[in-house]
A protein has these predicted regions:
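Membrane-interfacial alpha-helical segments at the cytosolic side of multi-pass membrane proteins
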Residues: 102-118, 167-183
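"…centered on the first transmembrane helix and the immediately adjacent amphipathic helix/loop
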Residues: 20-108
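Cationic, low-complexity basic patches in intrinsically disordered or flexible, solvent-exposed regions
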Residues: 4, 14
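Small-polar-interrupted transmembrane alpha-helices in polytopic inner-membrane proteins
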Residues: 40-45, 130-147
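Interfacial helix-loop-helix junctions of multi-pass membrane proteins
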Residues: 142-166
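Short, charged juxtamembrane terminal tails flanking transmembrane helices
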Residues: 187-197
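Internal alpha-helical transmembrane segments of multi-pass membrane proteins
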Residues: 119-135
Length: 197
């Protein structure tokens, strides 16, 4: 009887170890994936910031050329000079929106990476720590990106851009935090209904 019991315990331990190894492998893969995505976002931001004002202006000009007549009111009635001014303003808006989206992606990916270090049964502590870690990293990268632009011809370091980038970072992170909390609430509801049964 005791031998059977020991055999059953060993079998259960082996099964638990196998499940744990599979979970660790999956977590390692997800962690690696989000690390690569975070570094990819950093590289994309760096390359876009390394483009001088002329190249950056051409890129946003290409994007705004087609929608300009639709987006700008009375575009056809404006003089060529006024059209150019309006397109430049639209281009500036597109660049700011692009920057905001880049940093939104960085916030999302870096927060996802930090969340892979959180234990499943840990409720608030590590979620908050992951949030702070990702926020600190992303904002520091936004500041370093602005400092980088000092050395790029025609570009400048602007505090306003750091604020815009930080808004993008927070948007990405808050979306993810909302999804995590919703998933957690769903799991808790499922568990409580299972317990009641």
């Amino acid at each position: 009887f005791f031998q059977q019991d020991r055999h059953h315990i060993r079998k259960t331990q082996r099964k638990d170890a196998l499940v744990k190894t599979e979970k660790e492998k999956r977590t390692g893969f997800i962690r690696g994936l989000f690390l690569i995505l975070t570094l990819g976002c950093c590289l994309l931001i760096f390359l876009n910031s390394a483009a001088d004002s002329e190249v950056s202006g051409k890129q946003s000009g290409t994007i705004t050329e087609a929608p300009a007549p639709v987006v700008i009111p009375n575009y056809d009635q404006l003089s060529p000079g006024e059209q150019k001014t309006q397109k430049n303003e639209l281009g500036s808006l597109v660049r700011k929106a692009g920057h905001c989206l880049e940093f939104m992606a960085l916030g999302l990916c870096s927060f996802s990476f930090c969340l892979t270090f959180r234990k499943k049964n840990d409720r608030q502590g590590r979620l908050f720590l992951a949030f702070l870690s990702a926020l600190a990293f992303s904002v520091l990268y936004a500041v370093s990106d602005e400092i980088h632009q000092i050395f790029v011809p025609g570009r400048a370091c602007e505090f306003e851009d750091v604020v815009t980038d930080t808004m993008g970072i927070l948007c990405g992170m808050l979306v993810l935090a909302g999804l995590v909390r919703a998933k957690r609430a769903k799991e808790a509801a499922r568990q409580s209904s299972f317990t009641l049964q």
